[in-house]
């Protein structure tokens, strides 16, 4: 196979070599002037082109541009704190989550929701969540009694995936579609998920649903499991979850548990917190302020 010979006399850089056995030295400018023909089957052709682009006009390697550090999940330990002393039950968090993550409007399908938990003197916690709290709760004074028992406490309690350190959902998935990342967030691989629903049954917090036919996830897949991901596409680019961003009273706090100055670390130092269903040993990464107990 013959190769084209570049005449040094036509080389605009005058880069001919004195070695009679070697061809002319080709500079970046010469190559770009002649045009580079890409050969798809040639291994490393992309690397070669990148290398040429890094050359200076005289053929010398220039100083490369600094490369931005990529997100390292192993460097983070994301956590979440809900301050029920602050929550006003407005439902903006639910709306923001649905819009950000393409969650169906039907309250049966939700990544986060808000409950009103009314505790009575007999120790019973009564829970209601009309439309998942998406449109807030009816204004007016709190009830003084429920079922003949005096009301001792009323509070709004946002709910979401607990991002458990010992998640029961991952172990039951028959195809490994639900998994835990190095930074502690539970995700669903939509390419693997077969929509069997085992993870929904295994989750003790009711934090999952199957995307119904006719609706889509951000990637456009119906019939797969979906759940809160702390808005993983946002937090891995330095932004806060949509629900945290929109909360008007700062009831939702998010941050890195490895950082003692993060909002969650500060909140957990300054106020007593509980995790839901602690007796199950799931070790949730979501903690609650202002709650002495929880609904059964």
Where do the PLM segments sit?
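N-terminal secretory signal peptides and thylakoid transit peptides that target proteins
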Residues: 13-39
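C-terminal segment of N-terminal export signals and the immediately downstream linker at the start
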Residues: 19-25, 45-89, 279-281, 287, ...
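Non-heme iron-sulfur electron-transfer modules
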Residues: 52-68, 100-149, 179-192, 207-227, ...
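Ferredoxin-like iron-sulfur electron-transfer modules
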Residues: 67-89, 120, 137-241, 245
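Hydrophobic alpha-helical membrane-insertion signals
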Residues: 90-92, 96-100
């Amino acid at each position: 196979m013959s190769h084209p010979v570049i005449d040094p006399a036509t080389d605009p850089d005058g880069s001919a070599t004195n070695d009679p056995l070697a061809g002319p030295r080709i500079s970046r400018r010469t190559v770009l002037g002649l045009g580079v023909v890409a050969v798809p089957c040639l291994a490393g052709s992309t690397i070669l082109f990148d290398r040429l682009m890094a050359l200076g006009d005289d053929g010398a390697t220039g100083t490369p541009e600094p490369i931005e550090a990529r997100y390292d999940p192993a460097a983070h330990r994301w956590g979440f704190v809900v301050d029920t002393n602050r929550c006003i039950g407005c439902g903006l968090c639910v709306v923001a989550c649905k819009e950000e993550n393409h969650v169906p409007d039907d309250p049966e399908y939700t990544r986060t929701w808000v409950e009103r938990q009314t505790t009575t003197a007999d120790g019973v916690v009564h829970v209601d969540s009309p439309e998942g709290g998406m449109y807030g709760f009816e204004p007016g004074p709190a009830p003084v009694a429920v079922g003949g028992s005096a009301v001792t406490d009323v509070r709004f309690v946002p709910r979401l995936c607990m991002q458990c350190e010992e998640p029961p959902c991952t172990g039951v998935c028959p195809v490994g579609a639900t998994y835990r990342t190095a930074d502690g967030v539970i995700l669903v691989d939509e390419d693997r998920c077969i929509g069997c629903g085992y993870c929904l049954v295994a989750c003790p917090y009711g934090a999952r649903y199957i995307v119904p036919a006719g609706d889509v996830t951000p990637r456009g897949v119906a019939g797969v499991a979906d759940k809160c991901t702390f808005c993983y596409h946002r937090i891995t680019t330095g932004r806060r979850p949509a629900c945290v961003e929109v909360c008007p009273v700062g009831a939702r706090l998010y941050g890195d548990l490895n950082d003692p100055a993060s909002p969650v670390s500060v909140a957990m130092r300054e106020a007593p917190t509980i995790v839901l269903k602690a007796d199950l040993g799931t070790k949730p990464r979501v903690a609650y302020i202002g709650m002495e107990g929880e609904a059964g």
